[in-house]
Amino acid sequence: MSSVEELTQLFSQVGFEDKKVKEIVKNKKVSDSLYKLIKETPSDYQWNKSTRALVHNLASFVKGTDLPKSELIVNGIINGDLKTSLQVDAAFKYVKANGEASTKMGMNENSGVGIEITEDQVRNYVMQYIQENKERILTERYKLVPGIFADVKNLKELKWADPRSFKPIIDQEVLKLLGPKDERDLIKKKTKNNEKKKTNSAKKSSDNSASSGPKRTMFNEGFLGDLHKVGENPQAYPELMKEHLEVTGGKVRTRFPPEPNGYLHIGHSKAIMVNFGYAKYHNGTCYLRFDDTNPEKEAPEYFESIKRMVSWLGFKPWKITYSSDYFDELYRLAEVLIKNGKAYVCHCTAEEIKRGRGIKEDGTPGGERYACKHRDQSIEQNLQEFRDMRDGKYKPGEAILRMKQDLNSPSPQMWDLIAYRVLNAPHPRTGTKWRIYPTYDFTHCLVDSMENITHSLCTTEFYLSRESYEWLCDQVHVFRPAQREYGRLNITGTVLSKRKIAQLVDEKFVRGWDDPRLFTLEAIRRRGVPPGAILSFINTLGVTTSTTNIQVVRFESAVRKYLEDTTPRLMFVLDPVEVVVDNLSDDYEELATIPYRPGTPEFGERTVPFTNKFYIERSDFSENVDDKEFFRLTPNQPVGLIKVSHTVSFKSLEKDEAGKIIRIHVNYDNKVEEGSKPKKPKTYIQWVPISSKYNSPLRVTETRVYNQLFKSENPSSHPEGFLKDINPESEVVYKESVMEHNFGDVVKNSPWVVDSVKNSEFYVEEDKDSKEVCRFQAMRVGYFTLDKESTTSKVILNRIVSLKDATSK
């Protein structure tokens, strides 16, 4: 990784302005990629504004990852073949998908190289579009211009055209049709109340800005705010601190050390954020260290999953290391411990060790503790037997290396812990080199020391381990990191243990370890929960020394709030019934313009055609005319359709032989007496049009509505076992759901990153190619995302969370 000075110098050399350079170097992933891409160009290449922008664009796509054949794209840019950001995007996707097999010809074909669209051609398509939508434009006038731009931009015939030519042409042609703007195009003035709110809001903002002190976060208050500064943790050998500070430069250094023996769960997200976030807040560094000391339970899939989840949460390790990297040094220190008279080889059985530690036959502590018969063997004998363990002369269980601590201590962590055991298992990284493996209690503190960790942050279950942690470092004369403990995060109403989740998977109660009803991080991601929502949630909880037990509903509430601010809206019908408007012709079309997120113009808007046939929710119609609490469609009560000019009124029903409603006939109440206003309905409902012209509706293969997996808050307490507590309605699958055709735009633009989202405190840049980033609010139904099993011909949706309030009126 290049230094900031090197990055700044190179970016300035190719012509980026100082302000832009400062902006670029703030993003390490993008700046590192940009540096490498520039280095792939000839040293005498004459950069211009366009090529700088396009290569910067490419760097933002690469963002720190390895991209084989990236030189194909760079050469395409500097040779003038790739002229637009759209072409660069297409070229990037092609090279990313094909890797080393990528060719210049293949890239050019996939990115529109050589396709020239003239300004006259653009104008012809714009004029054609305006003619086709003339009535709507005449009605809605200039406020429709942004929508025209969006629609023209999406015309397949103009895919490779320069979008910079669109706006001036659209402006010219709209002006020809409508003439200059007049009073019809003026934006209505805000009311006095709105102005007052604005003033109060500005005052409040000003007051907040004026308040002294840094912004409050989980990293500068509570447990984390009270942590020691680098260099303040005491040492048995003060000279070691001097060496430590020289290595670290006085900066914070933390680590996240998972065991690669399973998938991470929601509790680990807090550990990830605490360790990576604390280091980042203090401009320090954080390791991702795999504690791979038990080869019998480790598997490559766990290593990869852990890396994915750390990256998904928005963190990049300073270095990825493995405890196995240090096996040679750990072995050397074990011999040092023996030579110092502080370790011995023990041949006791597991039961004998328990009795020596005062564990009674019924498993309870409190019995008399006594020394093992091997404890006072000579140093020479212990050293020889330990080497025999290393050389495979003992079978598993026949010999262990134990630390000689203090059996009179009240802490179980000082009762001669095991340091090494014999395991005849090949290691994923070291193969068959070792027949003995260090334990967590021996490895953890020493590797922390080797990596010069300044703050060894772990959960309170390891509180007693602090004494043995410090004891071992001191006995082998190494730097002693400071272990500090915070409360773990638990979610009630579910299970997090690997054994129980494995049982759920093996017995087919769930689809797999990433089933959206589980709380593994893989499952939460598949369900569609944004990583930013998790970080925001953890920040809200803060960090203390108390264990945090959170109900699922509270977690979902936090996710819902995050989604509310960051997702577009679409009309979607879960359980559809067809509606036919009898007083409208088959070719009737009324275009409704609907914002993707009301109140946030930057999300844009879309057009939905109202025709003489559409779908509504089956539950939005009731034959009961006496229910005064039901505000939707009934035989004697009209209902409004979202963004449609008039209400619809019931006319008749069609039912099948079983009595199920298959079609509702209505009238469109568009005949209003002159001088009168349309009658306002009691409520509005969502609808999805039936229109072959617009390829509507989009039919959903499966809509999976997820509820809590278990019926109680503590499944493990069920007298017949946790499996008996499973909620039979935890997954409800709908096979006939429909939604508006604009879902295609949502997929194309996902993740939906507008400025208000990108500038939020916990925004995390996500992989555009992952299906779960395609999130949206199904109006009046819930929040949904694409499931990983979806294909171009098969749409499968997962419900992330429900809306706040169930629709009851």
Curated annotation (Swiss-Prot):
For the motif 'HIGH' region, what are the positions? 258-268
What PROSITE patterns does the annotation carry?
AA_TRNA_LIGASE_I
Q: What class of enzyme is it?
A: ligase
UniProt binding sites for ATP: 259-261, 265-271, 459, 488-489, 496-498
Q: Name one GO biological process term.
A: glutaminyl-tRNA aminoacylation
**Disulfide topology:** none
Entry's transmembrane regions? none
* UniProt record similarity statement: Belongs to the class-I aminoacyl-tRNA synthetase family.
Q: NCBIfam families, alphabetically?
A: glnS
Name of the molecule in the record: Glutamine--tRNA ligase
Gene that this polypeptide is encoded by: GLN4
